[in-house]
Amino acid sequence: MYTLLSGLYKYMFQKDEYCVLILGLDNAGKTTFLEQSKTRFNKNYKGMSLSKITTTVGLNIGTVDVGKARLMFWDLGGQEELQSLWDKYYAECHGVIYVIDSTDEERLSESKQAFEKMVTSEALDGVPILVLANKQDVETCLSIPDIKTAFSDCASKIGRRDCLTQACSALTGKGVREGIEWMVKCVVRNVHRPPRQRDIT
C-alpha cells in the first residue's frame, strides 16, 4: 500500500528536474535567451526588460517547466576569465545550450575554441548539446551553413550524443520554444544521466 501511495504522490507532486547549462562567449545573448525561455514557458512570469540585461558576471539561474520535466538553467558568464569556471558545473548537468553570436564574425574562432574545449571534456560525455546561432534577426548575420562550416572540425569531437545546430533570435523569441522542447526530449531519454526529483507543491 505504501508503495502505491508513494508512486501516486510522485506522479502528482514531483517533477523530474534536469540541469541545463547555458554557455557561450560574453554578449552572445545567453541571458536574453534565458529570459525569453522563462517568459514563454512560465505563465505568470513577468520578465525583465531585455534592454536592461547586462553582461553576466558569475551565474544566473532560471527554472522552466515543460510537461513532466523541470529544467533548471544555469547561465554562466562567458568572459575569458570566467570560462575556467564552466567545468565546475559539468558533472551536475544534463544538457548544454551553447549560444553563438552569429553577427560577430571576428569572435567566431574564439567561440569555436571555447566550444571545442567544452565538448571534449570527459565530464560531459553523452550530454546533449544544442548550438544556437543567435541574433538571426540581424540582416548581416552568419547563416547556419556558415556556422557549421566554421565549426566543422569540431564535428568529430562531439562523439555519441544528441547535437543540434539551430537558428535563433533571443531578442524576438524565434527558435526559443523549439530549442527548449528539443532539449527536453533529449534529456528525458538520456539514461546515462537520470533526473533529480523535486516536489512541485
Curated annotation (Swiss-Prot):
Record has Cell division as a keyword: no
Protein name as annotated: ADP-ribosylation factor-related protein 1
Oligomeric form and interacting partners: Interacts with SYS1.
PROSITE patterns: ARF
Family matches, as NCBIfam families: small_GTP
Compartments where found: Golgi apparatus; Golgi apparatus, trans-Golgi network
MF annotations from Gene Ontology: GTP binding; GTPase activity
Function text: Trans-Golgi-associated GTPase that regulates protein sorting. Controls the targeting of ARL1 and its effector to the trans-Golgi. Required for the lipidation of chylomicrons in the intestine and required for VLDL lipidation in the liver.
Example of a GO biological process term: protein localization to Golgi apparatus
CDD domains reported for this sequence: Arfrp1
Binding site for GTP: 24-31, 75-79, 134-137
Keywords from the UniProt entry: Acetylation, Golgi apparatus, GTP-binding, Nucleotide-binding
Modified residues (N-acetylmethionine): 1
Classification via InterPro entries: P-loop_NTPase, Small_GTP-bd, Small_GTPase_ARF, Small_GTPase_ARF/SAR
Organism this protein belongs to: Bos taurus (Bovine)
Family membership noted in the UniProt record: Belongs to the small GTPase superfamily. Arf family.
GO cellular component: Golgi apparatus
